[in-house]
Amino acid sequence: MPALLKRLLFQVGPHPNERTFTLSSVSTDGHYISLRPFVKPSGDELSFPFEWAFAGTNETVKVNDQGNGVVTQDFNFWLDTNVYLNVPNTHRGEVNTTWKNWDSGCVEETGAVYPFGADKESVSFRELWQPVDPSREDLVIVSPNNEKFSSNARSIVLKVTDEAYDGLVIVIGRWIQGFLSQKNNNTIEGLNFIRLLXKDSGKSEFLLSYGKEVNKIPQSYENLKKGSTVTSNGLNWEVIEYHA
């Protein structure tokens, strides 16, 4: 079942906060992307207005159901903007997380990273997520009474890997998120992101568009099938998942 989650809270240390409009998309087959743009970027943030962004296929995450509403997820991100940009004091390697369902329908994520090295002191973090209905234009919460939610929302994933680019687009219902990165660039000039919302009118609205090559990311997702190829401004994308 596909999922769309909005982050409500981020906490490192004693003071929780939320400065971003973070949405994470998870496809039916387990591919994922999380875009975390600042709501009110300032100063140096204006040139790259993201707290973080990451993405990966289902081959880059290990999911284990622990029972009683607890799931562990261990990530080896395909794209990690902090790693891509060589940000100082960045965790490298697998990130281990634990997800716990709350009675309210929210999901608590906890974990730890090692920004100073695997043999150094860890930094714990906590995030709170609200599942939302991907078939709706508005951010309508899912299962407020902890009822099981079954979604018929479409789940489509496109991927590009060639000598020059990596990229992933995930369509969950009406909500589309994607990235495209230039290989061997490792600057903000090599990063591109989109967030689109398909409207009742049949048109798509850009909620986020970042990067000089964003037009190489597909923005139409009709008449596709698994294994087919979509070309966007000369760049070929493979449809690796199609449930619609």
UniProtKB/Swiss-Prot annotation:
Primary localisation category: cytoplasm
Name used for this protein in its record: Protein HRI1
Keywords for the protein's UniProt record, in alphabetical order: Cytoplasm, Nucleus, Phosphoprotein
Family the entry assigns: Belongs to the HRI1 family.
Species this protein is from: Saccharomyces cerevisiae (strain Zymaflore VL3) (Baker's yeast)
Gene responsible for this protein: HRI1
Subunit structure: Interacts with HRR25. May interact with SEC72.
Residue numbers bearing the Phosphoserine modification: S143
KW Phosphoprotein (keyword) present: yes
A GO CC term attached to the entry: cytoplasm
Keyword Electron transport among UniProt keywords: no
Location relative to the cell: Cytoplasm; Nucleus
Family annotation (Pfam families): HRI1
